[in-house]
Amino acid sequence: IKSQLLHTGEIERLSMERHGAIRLGTAAELSMMRRLFAVMGMHPVGYYDLAPAGVPVHSTAFRALDSHSLHKSPFRVFTSLLRLDLIADENLQQEATATLAQRQIFTTGVIELIEIFEAQGGLTAAQAEQFVQEALETFRWHDKTPVAKALYQRLLNQHPLVADVVGFKGPHINHLTPRTLDIDAVQQGMQARGIPSKAIIEGPPRRACPILLRQTSFKALQEAVGFKVANNSDASHEEYEQGHHTARFG
């Protein structure tokens, strides 16, 4: 593989992030996310319905389209939209819909810069720098949730992914995937260092021929979060109770 990458000039891209993933809650969020990614020259490619696999989302991947851009940055973001219609409990479906309707995952600043980009066909260097800072707010981790622990638990019981989308203020990046020349060595290295990893490498076994994709990761981390206290008497001061959430992995 190394010889092939040296021959094609791709070896320098080996250390680049190749793949990330986010999960969205509404069609409006997906529409604005499409516009946000377009600023960076990334466009939706492919359609994946994960419902037959028991995952209540359908997805696409945002990435560059032409070979020159892909050579400079092969990064793609697998973007999933929650299928609220697949929540069996009608009351829970309504609560989830209402919760998502109340959140805004994009800053005013990033929306303004997207509109400037669309109107003038690009951004200045200063605007581009500001755009990156504003966009980071959309993807960052929030350790305080907009839902009470009881609602979070009901969402979790429906499906962990439902809780991960509805239970948080934004679509935190749930994993990033680098590329390696030897994934077997990565798997063994994680296990040797006591890092909990997937039991097996996903994909075909090692073979004496090129393989499109084999992947592994460390297991999702249990992270401390604060759940919003329901029926808080002091509306001017939000209270939170401690809990945990498990979703982000790598």
Give a label for each model feature.
Residues 1-250:
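Extended, well-ordered protein cores
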